[in-house]
């Protein structure tokens, strides 16, 4: 079985997100050097917000810095330690960090949150499990936001394949989607909007000198918006939870 057909375990994820990253995460927030998806979340999320699978915590910390009331959870103890330490160093009292397995019932009451989001989690599960998780999470929030890799992004798809061929891909099973509307619908979530973001970020998966980069640079020079062409790295799906 290929390493790329298996989901990473807790220890493998902990190698990506741990206290060694503290200064880097804090610097991102202090210098306003956050990812395009963290920026996008500040445009969407208001009120009480829950992040499921917070990883480095950068998105939750950025939302907290921008005045949101945030709860962040992860099943990796090292991730939780990292985000708690970063929040303390940034003096952010409006972010709560919880160690919790998101594949099980969550320790919240129904509709406790205005927004629930995951960015970079659901792509590591097969479709049936994605739907089960969405259905479970939806009971705790009013709106659901999903950000997963975009299967229509040519630079991301080619770059990922190149890394798999070279044995340098680090994230195990990762299933991009052209659309996530059906999964939302089957989970009882009414889709309100779907689009892509991060076309520039998608090109980071490619070698620095690659003809696909040159092709997309020409498109941009000619006035094309690559996100409008569904070439963003992340597929953003927003929906209203029933109940």
Task: Please state what every model-predicted region is.
Residues 1-110, 115-119, 134:
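Conserved N-terminal segment of class I S-adenosyl-L-methionine
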Residues 97, 193-243:
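A C-terminal cap/extension of S-adenosyl-L-methionine-dependent methyltransferases
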Residues 123, 149-151, 196:
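Histidine-centered beta-alpha loop that forms part of the nucleotide-sugar donor binding/catalytic region
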Residues 125-136:
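A short, conserved alpha-helix within the catalytic core of class I
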Residues 68, 142, 189:
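Short phosphate-binding/catalytic loops that engage adenosine nucleotides
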Residues 141-149:
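Conserved beta-strand signature within the Rossmann-like core of class I S-adenosyl-L-methionine
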Residues 171-188:
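Short alpha-helix
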């Amino acid at each position: 079985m290929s390493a790329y057909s298996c989901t990473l375990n807790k220890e493998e994820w902990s190698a990506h997100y741990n206290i060694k990253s503290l200064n880097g995460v804090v610097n991102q927030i202090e210098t306003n050097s956050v990812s395009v998806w963290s920026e996008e979340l500040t445009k969407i999320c208001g009120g009480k917000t829950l992040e499921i699978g917070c990883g480095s915590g950068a998105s939750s910390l950025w939302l907290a810095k921008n005045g949101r009331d945030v709860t962040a959870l992860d099943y990796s103890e090292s991730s939780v330690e990292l985000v708690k330490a970063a929040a303390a160093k940034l003096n952010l009292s409006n972010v709560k960090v919880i160690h919790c397995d998101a594949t099980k019932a969550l320790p919240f009451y129904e509709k406790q949150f205005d927004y629930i989001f995951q960015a970079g989690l659901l792509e590591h599960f097969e479709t049936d499990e994605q739907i089960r998780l969405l259905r479970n999470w939806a009971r705790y929030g009013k709106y659901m936001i999903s950000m997963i890799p975009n299967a229509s992004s040519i630079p991301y798809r080619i770059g990922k394949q190149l890394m798999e061929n070279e044995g340098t891909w680090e994230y195990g099973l990762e299933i991009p989607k052209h659309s996530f509307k059906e999964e939302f619908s089957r989970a009882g979530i009414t889709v309100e909007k779907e689009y892509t973001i991060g076309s520039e970020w998608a090109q980071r998966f490619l070698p620095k000198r690659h003809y696909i980069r040159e092709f997309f640079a020409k498109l941009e020079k000619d006035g094309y918006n690559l996100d409008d062409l569904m070439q963003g790295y992340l597929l953003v799906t927003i929906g209203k939870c029933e109940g």
